[in-house]
Amino acid sequence: AFVDMELPLPEGECMLAPRVEARLLQALQVQKTDKVLEIGAGSGYMAALLAHRAQRVISLEIKPALAQLARANLQKASITNAEVREADGAKDVSVDGPFDVIVLSGSVAEVPQVLLAQLKPGGRLAAIVGNEPMMRATFVTRTGETGYTTTQPWDTVAPRLSNFPEPSRFN
C-alpha cells in the first residue's frame, strides 16, 4: 500500500509525496527514446518510474548515503537503464547533456539557467518552484535555441534541494 505523504529518508531528507511524483511524471509525457536527468535521487523511486518510460536516466544525488540507497533500490528492482551518480545537481549537470527531460525531485527558489541550457529543443523540465508556503509545479519546454514556454498548473510544497541558490532578500 502507498501512503500519500513525504516519506522520510536518511540524512534528514524526505521523498516527494507519491501524488506529486505521479503528477510530475504524467505531465512530462516521458517517451521510450528520452534521455532523462533527475536532480535529487533520494530513494531512487522517481528514477525507477522514469526508467520504466525512458531510454536512459541519470540521477544525481549530493548525499553519499542516499546515492548508495538509490543504487541499491534500483539494483533490487533489476533496473538497468538508470544510473545514480554522487554529484551536486546545482553544479555538475553538463556531463551527458543535452537531455530530453529534466526532473528536479525537490523544490528550488527558481529554475537555474544552467539546467535550462541542458534541455534539447523540445525538451521538458519539471520543478517545484517558490518559497513556502507558496510553491508551484513548474513545467518548462524549450521551444528553440533561446525560447522557452513555462506553465505553473498547480500549487504544492516540497522539501528544498541542497545547494541551489536562494533569491536575495532585502533586510
Regions found by a protein language model. Give the residues of each.
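Conserved nucleotide-cofactor-binding alpha/beta core module
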Residues: 29-145
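Active-site capping/gating segments
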Residues: 130-171
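Glycine-rich, flexible loop/turn motifs
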Residues: 3-5, 10-11, 95, 136, ...
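Conserved AdoMet
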Residues: 1-29
